[in-house]
Amino acid sequence: MKNKRALVLLFAAHMISSFAQGITMLAIPWYFTSVVNQSELFGKVLALATVLSVFWSLYAGTLIDRYPRKNIFWFTALAGLLCMGSIAAYGSQSDQMPIALVALAFVVTFFGYNIHYPNLYAFAQELAARGDYGRVNSMIEVVGQSTSVLSGAVGAILLSGTTTGGINLMGMHVKLPFEIAQWQLWEIFMLDASTYLAAACIIPFIRYQRMAELKVDLEPIFARLKKGVRFLTANRGLLMFGLASYATFIVLLVQVMYLLPLYIDRQLLSGADVYASSEVYFALGSLCAGLFIRSLTKHMAPAKAIVILMIGAGVLFLAVSSVKSVSFFYVFSLLLGFSNAGTRIIRVTYLFDHIPNNIIGRANSIFYLYNILMRSVLLSVFSLAFFSFENNVVWAYAICGMFILAALIPMVRIMPRLKGMQVVEVE
C-alpha cells in the first residue's frame, strides 16, 4: 500500500485527538442529565447546535474540496486547542464551570466533528489507491473504535472515580490497587485540549503522494456547492443510496448524544459506570465490524449487506424499548456497534468507488445536510417533556427502530439500480 507512513501518521493524529473527544462527549450529556438534572435544556442545546450545523457542514464540504486536507486537519486541531484550553483554564482559575461554558464546549466539539470526519474520509480517499478503499475504511473503523474502547474505559473511571476500591466496567467489578478521584469537567476539557496539541504536532510530518490528480474548483462557494448538487441529481441512484443508508447513523447520533444518558438514568436506574460501559461494548462491536465485515460480506452486494444490517439495527431498537435489563442493554450496544460500523464501512467504500475525490467533500455535505435535518426533527420531538418523564424514553427508542425500518423501503427499491452503476460526470 502506497502512502503507508502518511496513513499511519494520519491515523495516529486522529486516534490521539479522538481519545479525549470521546471522554468529553461522554461527560457533557451525563453532566446535564444526572449532575444538574437539565436533560431538557441539553436537548435544546443539541437541537440548536444541530440546526446551526446545517450551514457549517455545507460550508465545511466546500472547504474540504477547495483546500489541502492536511491543512484543514492542522487548523481544526489548533482551533480545538484554543477553545477547549480556554474553557478549561477558566474552570481551573474560577473553580466552577457555568452551564453556558459546558454547552459551548459541547458545541465546539460537535462542530469539530462536522468537519473532522468528512475531511478524514476525503483525505484517506486521496491517499489510497482505488483497490485499497475497503481496507483503508476498515482501518479507519478499527483505529476509531479502538480509541473509543479506551476512552470509554477511562471515561468510566474519570466520571465516577474509584472510591470503592475499584470500578464497575462492562458489568464487572474491577479492583484497583489505588484510588482515582472523580475528575471535574474542566480537567476533562484540559485533557481534551492537550490531545489537540499532540495532534497538531503530528500533522505537519505527514508527507504523501496523491494517488490521482486532484482537480480543485476555484469558483465561488455557491458555485462549488451547486456542482455537488448537480452531480448527485445526475446520479439519483447514488443519491438515494447515500440518503437511505444514513438512517442507522442518524438514529445512533440522537441516541448517543441525548437518549442514552436518559435511558440509563430513568429506565435502567443506573449510573455513570453503566453509561461508559455501554460505550465500550458499542466500540467493541464496531471494532469487530472493522475487522470482519469485509470478509463476511465479500460475496454480497453492498446494498443487500446494508439492508440486512439495517434490519438488525431496527429490531434491536424495538427490543431494547421493551426490555429492562442492564445485561441486555450491553448486548444491544455490542450488536448496534457492529451494525452501524458495518453499514458505514460498506457505505463509504461504495461512495468512494463512485464519487470523484475532488467532489467527495461536497457530496458528503449534502448527505450530511439530510442527516442534520432528520436529527433536528427527532431531537425536537424527543426534547419534549414527555420523553424525559419517568421511563418514557423507551418510546423514543421504539420510534428510532421504526425510523430505521422505514428507511429500508427506498433502499430495497433502488437495489437493482446499484448493480454495475455507471457514474455520470458533471462539469
State where each predicted segment sits.
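Juxtamembrane intracellular "pre-TM" segments in multi-pass secondary transporters
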Residues: 1-7, 208-243
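Substrate-agnostic recognition of the 12-TM MFS/MFS-like secondary transporter fold
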Residues: 9-25, 46-64, 68-80, 100-162, ...
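Transmembrane alpha-helix termini and helix-breaking/packing motifs in multi-pass membrane transporters
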Residues: 29-34, 88, 92-93, 150-189, ...
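Cytoplasmic membrane-interface "Motif A"-like loop-to-helix N-cap segments
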Residues: 66-80, 297-310, 392
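C-terminal ends and interior cores of transmembrane alpha-helices
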Residues: 78-95, 311-324
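Helix-loop junctions on the cytosolic side of multi-pass membrane transporters
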Residues: 122, 126, 181-185, 189-219, ...
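A single, central transmembrane helix in multi-pass transporters
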Residues: 166-175, 184-185, 230-290
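C-terminal transmembrane helical hairpin of 12-TM major facilitator-type secondary transporters
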Residues: 303-343
